[in-house]
Amino acid sequence: MTDTNHSSMRQHSLQSLAIAAIGVVFGDIGTSPLYSLKEAFSPAHGIPLTPSAILGVISLLFWAIILVVGIKYVLFVMRADNNGEGGVLALMALSLRPLNPKSRITGLMMALGIFGACMFYGDAVITPAISVMSAVEGLEVATPQLSHLVLPITIVILIALFWIQRHGTATVGKLFGPIMVIWFVTIAALGVYHIARAPMIVSAINPYYAFSFMSEHVLLAYVVLGSVVLVLTGAEALYADMGHFGAKPIRLAAYVLVMPSLVLNYFGQGALLLLDPKAIENPFFLLAPQWAALPLVVLSTVATVIASQAVISGAYSLTSQAIQLGYVPRMKILHTSELAIGQIYVPVVNWLLLFVILCIVIGFKSSDNLAAAYGIAVTATMVITTILAAVVMVKVWNWNKLLVAMIIGVFLVIDLGFFGANLLKVEQGGWLPLGIGALLFFLLMTWYKGRHIVKERTAADGIPLAPFLQGLLAHPPHRVSGTAIYLTGNDTLVPVSLLHNLKHNKVLHERTIFMTFVTRDIPYVKDDERVTVHDAGEGLYIVKAEYGFNETPDVKAVLEEVSCQRAMTFELMDTSFFLARETVVPTHLPGMSIWRERVFAWMHQNAAKPTDFFAIPANRVVELGTKIEI
C-alpha cells in the first residue's frame, strides 16, 4: 500500500473519530447556547440591554471560549494525559506519581483530585435537568398553548433516558455524532443569518468591549461572570473523554466545527438583541423563524438528551475509576456491549442520579431558576484541574518553574474569577452542587481512610505468607482433590480464609492458588504484563493480577492466563473460591472518630459482594467470617 493510501486512511479515521467525539464530548458545551446569554441578562442582575452592554457581554463570552476552551484545555491541559487517559482522577494519579507518598503535598493533591471528582457528580445532576428543561421550554415560543406541559414532558424524557441505560446505548450511539454535527451546523446558520442583519455585533471580537463593560458596571459585571461561565459547561469533557477518542480528533472537532459554531450562535443572539432587546425572553429560540421553531425544539431536545447521555456515561466511568483506585466501595458494574469495553452500566449510580435529577426538576421548576446552581461545580473543577496540571508541568515534565508560574497564573486568575463570581450565587442555588460535592467528598475520604485503617490492622495481625508456606510444606495437612482459590488483598500475608479453613476443616486442596488484584495508577495494563505466577511448590501458586484504573478485574480471564503460563486447565464450576467476609467493628482505637467509623462500617456492609464484582459463580464460593476492629 502506498504512503498516499496510508495517509488517506489515517485522515479518514481521524475524521470519523472527530465526528464520533462531537456526539459524546461536545454535547454539554454545545447545548449551552440554549440558556447562557439569557441567564447573563437575567433581570436579577440588573444589566441594561443597551448596545454597549450587549457588545460587552458577547465579548466576554467570546474571550471566555477562546481562552478557556481553545487555549487552556485544548492546547495545554490535554497534553497532561495519563497514558492517553484524561479526567480529574487520571490527572490526580499522574500528579501523585513523582511525589513522596507521605508528604503533605501528596495528601493535598489527592484531596483536590477527589473533590474535583465529587464536583463532577454535582454537575452531573444539573446538566440533564437544565439541558432537557431548557430545550422543552422552547415550546413556550413555538406553541405557547403547550407551555403548561414543559415540566411533565421534561420528567417523562428524563425517566425514559435513565430507563434505557441498562440496555446500553451502543446502537443509537452511532447516530449521536451525525446528529450533533447537524445541531452545530444549525446553530451556526441561525447565528450567521442574524449577524448579517446586524453586523455591528462582530466588533465584540475586540476585547475592548469586554474591559469597557467590566469597568463601567464593576460589581454587576462581576456577577454577570457567574453566568458567562455557563458557556464553558462541558469544557472539562474535552479532557475527561480524551481516552475514548484521542487528543487529535477532539482538537480537530473543537477548532473546525464546535468553537466556530458556538461563537457564531452567540454573536447571532447578540445581533438579535441589538435589533430587538425584547428577544431576551428566549434569544436562542427566537433566532429561528416561526415555521422553524417547533423543529428546532425537537432538534434541541434530541441534542440535550445526547448531552445528558454523555454526562451519565461519564458518571459511570468515573465511578468505575474511583472503585479501582480505592475511593468508592465495590458496586455492581454491568458491561452493556461485547465490543466496546467502555460501555458500562452502574445500577446504583443510575437510579440515584435519576432520583436527584427529578427532585431538582420538580423543585426548581424552570431552567432560569436552575441556572444559578450550575456554574459553581464547573468552575471548582476548572480550578482543581489547573492546580493539578501545574504539578504535572513542574514535577513530571520538568518545565521551567517561572514559565509554569506565568502560564498557570493567567489561567488561575480566569478560573478563580469565574469561581468567585459563582460563589455569589450560593444562596440562589449554588448550595446544591456544593452540598452534593461536600457530602460525596466526606463519604469518599471516609471510605479511603477506613480501608487504609483496615489494611493496617490486617497487616499488624497478619502472618507472612512465605515462611508460613514453608512450614505448611514441611508439615503438610491432608490434601483433597480439586482447586481452591483464595482471594486476598495482600499477596505477602496468609489469607484469613485459609487460616479458618485449616483450623476448621484441616485440609488443603491439591492445587491451591492465592490470587491478588492490584490497581496501578495507569488506565490500562498491557496483557503481557497483567498476570504473574509464582510457583511455591507442591501445587501452591501465588498469582498477582494487575489492572489499570479504567479496567474491571476479571477472575475468569486471569485463570485463562494462568492456564497459558503454567499449562494448567481450570473448570470454573469445579473450582472453590474462598473469601473472607470482613465485619468491621467501630471502636475507640486511634484512626477515625467513632461516628465516621460507623459510617465506614455501613458503607462496608452495603458494598457489592465480591462474587458480584468479580463475576464469580455464587455456588462456588465459600465465605469465612472475620471481625476487624477499627
From Swiss-Prot:
Where it sits in the cell: the answer is: Cell inner membrane
Q: Which UniProt keywords apply?
A: Cell inner membrane, Cell membrane, Ion transport, Membrane, Potassium, Potassium transport, Symport, Transmembrane, Transmembrane helix, Transport
Membrane topology, as annotated, equals: Multi-pass membrane protein
**Cross-referenced InterPro entries:** K+_transporter, K_trans_C, K_trans_N, Kup
Gene Ontology CC, one term: plasma membrane
Alphabetized GO MF terms: potassium ion transmembrane transporter activity; symporter activity
Q: What is its main location?
A: membrane
What's its catalytic activity?
Answer: K(+)(in) + H(+)(in) = K(+)(out) + H(+)(out)
**Regions that span the bilayer:** 17-37, 51-71, 105-125, 144-164, 175-195, 218-238, 255-275, 283-303, 344-364, 374-394, 402-422, 428-448
Tell me the PANTHER family matching this sequence: LOW AFFINITY POTASSIUM TRANSPORT SYSTEM PROTEIN KUP, OSMOTIC STRESS POTASSIUM TRANSPORTER
Query: What does the similarity note say?
Result: Belongs to the HAK/KUP transporter (TC 2.A.72) family.
> What's this chain's function?
Transport of potassium into the cell. Likely operates as a K(+):H(+) symporter.
Name of this protein: Probable potassium transport system protein Kup
Tell me the organism.
Burkholderia thailandensis (strain ATCC 700388 / DSM 13276 / CCUG 48851 / CIP 106301 / E264)
This protein's encoding gene? kup
